[in-house]
Amino acid sequence: MAEKQAGLVGEPDPEGSSPGTSESWNYDSNCVFCRVAAGQEPKTELFHCENEDLVCFKDIKPAALYHYLVVPKKHIGSCKDLNKDHIEMVESMVAAGKTMLERNNFTDFTDVRMGFHVPPFCSISHLHLHVIAPVKEFGFLSKLVYRQDSYWFVTVDYLLEKLRK
């Protein structure tokens, strides 16, 4: 079910911005990932990201042993809303995902899937990078849901290639 996008977009972080974050990042009170990024979902453990404009947390329905979501604090609907100006942000999201795997001593990056679901196949309408490893552990459904460069899921490499054109 898609997350409702109505609500207060552009509202400042109700808890106040953390040091180094954009003072006016878009906030949608109806978006669960905006609330997670603002620290308003206490059951969601946030992991440190070097880039203060991002948050990282575990997926609630992991497809493999390691399944993290890297999310910009700024509300961006999906990968369809990105352009060349977002390349650096996407690259930072990838770096944050790799760091999470390395912290867990996972370094076989040939067995990692990183990518985004494409609307209307997004369960939450807030941009989020899936960082999943090891891919060899995927069951039948995960192989389908996270199928590389399908109509519903695109890899980071595919997205960056499109953004650079």
From Swiss-Prot:
Keywords assigned by UniProt, alphabetized: Acetylation, Cytoplasm, Hydrolase, Nucleotide-binding, Nucleus
UniProt cross-references to Pfam families, sorted A to Z: DcpS_C
Binding site for AMP: 59-60, 128-130
Main location: cytoplasm
UniProt domain HIT: residue ranges: 32-143
GO molecular function, one term: nucleotide binding
Entry-linked PROSITE patterns: HIT_2 (PS51084)
Residue positions where N-acetylalanine is found in the record: 2
Gene3D superfamilies noted in UniProt: HIT-like
Similarity comment: family membership: Belongs to the HINT family.
Quaternary structure annotation from Swiss-Prot or TrEMBL: Forms dimers to octamers and even larger oligomer. Interacts with CALM1.
This protein's name: Adenosine 5'-monophosphoramidase HINT3
Organism: Mus musculus
